[in-house]
Amino acid sequence: MLKVGLPLGACARSWKSVRMASCGMARRNPLDNKVALVTASTDGIGFAIARRLAQDGAHVVVSSRKQQNVDRAVATLKGEGLSVTGTVCHVGKAEDRERLVATAVKLHGGVDILISNAAVSPFFGSLMDVPEEVWDKILDVNVKATALLTKAVVPEMAKRGGGSIVIVSSIAAYSPFPSLGPYNVSKTALLGLTKNLALELAESNVRVNCLAPGLIRTSFSRVLWEDPARQESIKATFQIKRIGKPEECAGIVSFLCSEDASYITGETVVVAGGSLSHL
């Protein structure tokens, strides 16, 4: 008797394809042709986010305060076959924010995604010893610039029918890091900014969410993990007893920018190994 059909291996592959399509797994590029701006994206968490967004199909504009850092990041990501350009941007300067948005519009026709990641933390010590100019600098860059860059980018998102914004806060918003008082306060402020922006921008179909990373191994957080005793003290508060990796933040951000998160706004996702995350 002649038996007609697919070989067993082919049947298995066909069935796997059906299952992947049924649950949305067949969509290889969830951010296909989206245009994304990522601030402070030449190193650490920002760089990992830029890479992941580009891997997921977005055209990404990376930025940093130094041209050599921008050039290095762009060269690295282009070397991986990703669609990436870059420009210098100090988010505390209005002209730099304007140039960042203009670069995306000129090269790609608009903006769909903003990742607000830039932050400074120039002080380590008692909150009672913080000079006024340090307060001004931290709040200017970490909070005010985030709001003003959002203001600059929303009209471009509206032209394209909406968009997604992810603000990068920190677990320090919930559980303050010792001796980093002004930074902790600024990151708590971003939780409130996220809620307010989400409320106001919903009518423009712009979603606003927040990422709160825990202790992630980056140059920015080195002061917290380079000393073994301090590192062990901090890790003792984690349920997952290790320092996180930038890539463990990037996937969450890509999800929040995708259609899979189309009914999520005003929320903060904590990526912190089980650290306490309640105000």
From Swiss-Prot:
Q: Which residues carry this modification: N6-acetyllysine?
A: K93, K106
Where is NADP(+) annotated to bind? 37-61, 187
List of residues binding substrate: S170
Instruction: Name its cellular compartments.
Output: Peroxisome
Q: Extract the Pfam families matched here.
A: adh_short_C2
Q: Residues where N6-succinyllysine occurs? A: K93, K235
Q: Which residues form a coiled coil?
A: none
Q: Does the keyword Phosphoprotein apply?
A: yes
Naming one, the record's GO cellular component terms include: mitochondrion
- Which residues are reported to carry the modification Phosphoserine? S221
EC number in record: 1.1.1.184, 1.1.1.300
Please indicate which residues carry the site annotation Important for the maintenance of the quaternary structure, the catalytic activity and cold stability. N196
What Gene Ontology molecular-function terms does this entry list? all-trans-retinol dehydrogenase (NADP+) activity; carbonyl reductase (NADPH) activity; identical protein binding
Q: Mainly localized where?
A: other
Q: What does this gene product do?
A: NADPH-dependent oxidoreductase which catalyzes the reduction of a variety of compounds bearing carbonyl groups including ketosteroids, alpha-dicarbonyl compounds, aldehydes, aromatic ketones and quinones. Reduces all-trans-retinal and 9-cis retinal. Reduces 3-ketosteroids and benzil into 3alpha-hydroxysteroids and S-benzoin, respectively, in contrast to the stereoselectivity of primates DHRS4s which produce 3beta-hydroxysteroids and R-benzoin. In the reverse reaction, catalyzes the NADP-dependent oxidation of 3alpha-hydroxysteroids and alcohol, but with much lower efficiency.
UniProt note: domains? The C-terminus peroxisomal targeting signal tripeptide is important for peroxisomal import. Once in the peroxisome, it is involved in intersubunit interactions. Three specific residues, Phe-177, Leu-180 and Asn-196 are conserved between non-primate mammals whereas the respective residues are serine, phenylalanine and threonine in primates. The two residues at positions 177 and 180 are molecular determinants responsible for the stereoselective reduction of 3-ketosteroids and benzil. The presence of an asparagine at position 196 is important for the maintenance of the quaternary structure resulting in stability at cold temperature and improved catalytic activity toward retinal.
Q: Which family does it belong to?
A: Belongs to the short-chain dehydrogenases/reductases (SDR) family.
Protein name, as recorded: Dehydrogenase/reductase SDR family member 4
- Which lineage? Eukaryota, Metazoa, Chordata, Craniata, Vertebrata
The encoding gene: DHRS4
